[in-house]
Structure formats: C-alpha cells, structure tokens
C-alpha cells in the first residue's frame, strides 16, 4: 500500500514538473507583436489569405501550435525548404510565438467551388 502511494506521488510530481517545464519553454504569443514582425512573411504568404503563389500555404486561421511546430521544424532542419529554413534561422522563440499568435488570429477566407471568396 505504501509503495502504491509513493508511486502515485512520484507520478504526480513528474507530471507537474513536465507541465511546468513545457509552460516555461514556450513563450506566450502576442498577436500585435506578431503583426509587426510579419512583414517578411508577407513577401511570400501575402496577408495570410492571399499568397503570391498558390503553392505557398495560407497562414490565416491556422492553429498556433501547428504554426509554431512548423517554424521550429524549419529552424531545426527537420522540415526541408531552403527559403523557410533560412527565414526560420533568424527567429527567436518569442518571434515564433508572436507570429503564430498573429496568423492564428486572422480570419481565414473560405472559397466556394468556383474559387470565389465567401
């Protein structure tokens, strides 16, 4: 019985520390700050809804976790793209959080089957 209590306490402690560490590791994003930093992104991704090339992803309304993960993977080299890899190298953790918050805050444009925005 005592061993079971020790196991539960140890598990609770490990989980608490893991959640605390992840909260400290990921800064909170600020959409207003991200908007100020998004000028370079707009060169390819446009305003988030209208990209300069249809092969570039639209960023507006994407989940911030997805955007953050993608930028981290470009920065680490896990995702391969020469342009994004180079851009991501210049980003701090706070930049990534801010940009993720900004693009997630934008309303995505939905198109009907004929391609017209609704």
Listing of model-derived features with the role each one plays in the protein:
Residues 31-42, 51, 60-69:
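Sequence context surrounding c-type heme c attachment/ligation sites in exported
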Residues 2-12:
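Bacterial N-terminal signal peptides that target proteins for export
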Residues 20-23:
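N-terminal signal peptide c-region/cleavage motif recognized by signal peptidases
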Residues 26-38, 47, 79-118:
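Flexible coil segments in periplasmic/lumen-exposed cytochrome c-class electron-transfer proteins
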């Amino acid at each position: 019985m005592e061993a079971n209590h020790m196991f539960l306490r140890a598990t609770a402690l490990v989980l608490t520390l893991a959640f605390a560490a992840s909260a400290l590791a990921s800064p909170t994003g600020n959409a207003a700050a991200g908007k100020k930093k998004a000028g370079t992104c707009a060169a390819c991704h446009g305003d988030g809804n209208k990209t300069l090339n249809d092969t570039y992803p639209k960023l507006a309304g994407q989940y911030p976790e997805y955007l953050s993960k993608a930028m981290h993977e470009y920065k680490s080299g896990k995702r391969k793209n020469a342009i994004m890899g180079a851009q991501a190298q210049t980003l701090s953790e706070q930049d990534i959080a801010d940009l993720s918050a900004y693009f997630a805050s934008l309303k995505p444009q939905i198109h009907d089957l004929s391609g017209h925005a609704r």
